Amino acid sequence: VFARLFTPLVRRLNRKKRGASLLGRGNIKKKSAQVNYICAYHSIHDNMKKLNRRDFVKQSSMAAGGVLLGSSLLSAQAYASGSDVIRVGLVGCGGRGTGAAVQALLSGQAVRLTAMADAFRDNLDRSYQQIKGELEDHELPADRLAVPEEHKFTGFDGYERVLPHCDVVLLAAPPGFRPQHFAAAVKAGKHVFMEKPVAVDAPGVREVLAAAAEARQKKLNVVVGLQRRYEAQYLKWVELLQEGAIGDIVTAHVYWNSGGVWVHQRQPGQTEMEYQMRNWYYFNWLCGDHINEQHIHNLDVGNWVKQAYPVKAHGMGGRQVRNGLDHGEIYDHHFVEYEYADGSRMFSQCRHIEGTHYRVTESFQGTSGSAPAPGIILTRSGYRLLEHDARRDPNPYQVEQDVLFAAVANGEYRYADAENAAKSTLTALMGRMATYSGQMVEWDAALHSELSLMPERLAWDAPPPVLPDAAGRYPIAIPGVTKVL
């Protein structure tokens, strides 16, 4: 009896740290001071502290976070399997892909993971075991993980082999592959969850925009992992700012200043392609630089509040500290000034340097007040119009899976996030173009650039688009010299 009662608890404790990172909780920033929600005139969040996750999903599905469509029924049947079970395929078995798969299984719907793909078999096997452990922790039926050996695919073409075995596909491979994977999923008629960013260059952005239009035509739900659009404290905050709570927005300040991310050293026997694929964060054809891969979250919030995209950008950046042989070609800091059509500005900072001040947030200044942090709105006199306590809010990483799978299970077409995600990706890429070149970069020029970062051929023996010199160093962008358009 003792073992039956306490073994599940011990398992949970043993996996607590791993699970927090896997499911995205470790990425949710903490407020430095306790805040209380005191905005009484908008009912959607008046009782937020009393809501559980399922109740929140019901309410937030009517809010303006992701691109929510008027509900319409899907043509024919809701999903291709012709049963009550929603089959899910996972493409990209890293930490975020694994976390998304677990959250899909926890969505409250009859979801079964039926196929997996990754460039590397060890990543796939590790992901499979982590998902299995999470199912045990949450006491879910073991048959939710139904991936036979013949449905475990590796290599560059694994994504194509996953698609016949699923109704919904989770796309979480490195961002450089996202346009190709998304276009194939839409062509195959699959509902999609895909991680941000959705491209690393302008041709990729255009491919995603075209696939987004096709997904709309086919009534395929698409949710993108810009999870702030599914986060309680952001939903009401942005709604009030859009309604003019601080007047006209004059400036936005958005930040992702942190110590950086993982790095994988070159191993004996690796081809150059395998090394770059393993260490993908540090190569633009795979990642797009951290202004794109990470800072897109904050840039997207700026666009969301403004309900617009910038028309031009200029800035500066460089590679001052993080400049080892395994740090590829990306910068360690960027500062960009974006301008919108109405003349307002968004000032953007992102930095990956250990030992520096940590700041990951967004703030806005208006003609009659300010929004100094997510969930807080002040009048010019200092009166707090909004002060939201986020401690009991649902995990937005879970919410985005809940709403997607609820729509699919109910046969509804409700979510079309891809177009906005492509345009916020282009916002980030404009910033990179500006810092790499030292030039003013305009939206139309960036969108129509023909400069592709992707390799001509994807194979383990093929050369990647950027190669090291004899000393093992990669070419680094030089402002005033580097061409970006």
Task: Label every PLM stretch briefly.
Residues L135-L171:
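A structured beta-alpha segment of the ubiquitous adenosine-cofactor-binding alpha/beta core
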Residues L5-T7, N14-R18, I28-L51:
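N-terminal secretory signal peptides
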Residues P179-Y230, G244:
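Beta-strand-loop-alpha-helix segment that lines the small-molecule cofactor/substrate pocket
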Residues Q59-A63, V67-L68, G99, E293, ...:
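C-terminal helical cap and adjacent loop that interface with cofactors, partners, or active-site loops
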Residues A63-A142, E231, G302, K483-L485:
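N-terminal Rossmann-like dinucleotide-binding module
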Residues M48-A64:
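N-terminal secretory signal peptides and thylakoid transit peptides that target proteins
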Residues G92-G97, Q217-V224, R228-G328, Y338, ...:
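Predominantly a Rossmann-like dinucleotide-binding segment in NAD(P)-dependent oxidoreductases
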